[in-house]
Amino acid sequence: MPEELRNMIEREAMRLIDERRKAQKMTIDDLARKLYPDKPLPAARMMIQRLRTAQGSKPPRKMNLGEYVELTRAVGLEPSATLTVIMQNFDETRI
């Protein structure tokens, strides 16, 4: 799978997670506290932000599978069903 396509899939996952988070009126801080209760809030927030936005000249950090599962569950999404929705947004010939 081309790297560009992997990046697009990850960005779509983050878009759906953010969409659900906002629909629930959950802030980034709320999500950070839920995912990383043992970390100071600024550090927890930064861990999420690195997945969402570019940091300086670097692209957003790649999301690993565990993070994907934690993020989707934290906003009330079912990981496998959400992945199915994400993959339906991409042409099979590109995958």
Feature-to-residue mapping (PLM):
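A short, Lys/Arg-rich alpha-helix, primarily the initiator
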Residues: 1-34
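Short, charged recognition helix plus adjacent turn
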Residues: 2-7, 73, 80-95
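Residue-level signal for the short linker/turn that defines the boundary of a DNA-recognition helix
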Residues: 15, 25-26, 43, 63-66
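Residues in the recognition helix of alpha-helical DNA-binding motifs
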Residues: 20, 34, 47-51, 85-86
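Residues in the helix-turn-helix
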Residues: 30, 43-47, 81
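Recognition helix of helix-turn-helix/homeodomain-like DNA-binding domains
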Residues: 36-61
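Short, basic-rich loop-to-helix N-cap that marks the start of a DNA-contacting helix
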Residues: 55-73
